[in-house]
Design a protein with these regions (language model features):
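Amphipathic alpha-helical repeat scaffolds of TPR domains
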Residues: 78-87, 94-107, 114-148
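Long, charged N-terminal interaction/targeting segments
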Residues: 1-3, 11, 124, 155, ...
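Short, solvent-exposed segments of well-ordered alpha helices
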Residues: 41-48, 90-93, 115-118, 150, ...
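N-terminal cysteine/histidine-rich coordination modules
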Residues: 1-79
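A short, charged
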Residues: 54-56, 91-94
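Short coil/linker segments at helix-helix boundaries
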Residues: 32-42, 76, 80-86, 137-165
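Amphipathic alpha-helical segments of tetratricopeptide repeats
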Residues: 107-111, 129, 164-170
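Helix-turn-helix repeat elements of alpha-solenoid scaffolds
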Residues: 92-105, 156-168
């Protein structure tokens, strides 16, 4: 909780205001960097908080892309995401499952709004890093540990491959 603060946003698609949990960058202490440049911080996985999702219309994007949406893209989101979107519950402390659902929604939004390949690739990379964090923090005593690790490892590999292909085509 010491790492988290509430930030208020106005959705660029539906123009409604909402709050989102974000990481206080001054509180997160870097402890290592993986070979693929994923930063690992003590006490918090910042990747779980890098997607901003409007709980009203379903517009979702990585923080760096959230406000940069053109009117034709917003129209595509309203027509293809908002119509079928079901509100999700919001928690201050985001679980890995919640974070991955937000990443999936963010990737779907990127595809629908015809975002650049680099945006889709970066979303896949950040999602892969979140999956890796999930694997590192999953309860080893859980009954489904081996099955869950296999599932998550396959997801991470697929996301890394998608990110690589996206960056190459960008």
């Amino acid at each position: 909780k010491d790492f988290i603060f509430e930030k208020t946003y106005e959705c660029p698609v539906c123009y409604k205001e909402f709050k989102e949990s974000k990481v206080k960058s001054s509180r997160a202490r870097l402890i290592k960097q993986d070979r693929d440049l994923r930063n690992v911080y003590q006490g918090i996985d910042v990747n779980k908080y890098e997607v901003t999702s409007c709980p009203h219309c379903g517009y979702s994007a990585l923080d760096k892309y959230f406000t940069g949406i053109a009117a034709p893209q917003a129209k595509l989101i309203k027509e293809n995401i908002s119509k079928t979107f079901t509100r999700f519950s919001r928690h201050t402390i985001v679980t890995y499952d919640e974070a991955l659902e937000r990443y999936k929604l963010s990737l779907a939004n990127s595809i629908v709004k015809k975002a650049k390949d680099s945006e889709k690739a970066y979303t896949c990379l950040k999602m892969a890093w979140t999956v890796r964090g999930y694997m590192e923090n999953y309860d080893r005593a859980a009954d489904d540990y081996d099955e869950k690790m296999e599932e998550l490892k396959l997801n991470e590999e697929e996301l890394i491959l998608n990110a690589l292909e996206g960056f190459i085509s960008a």
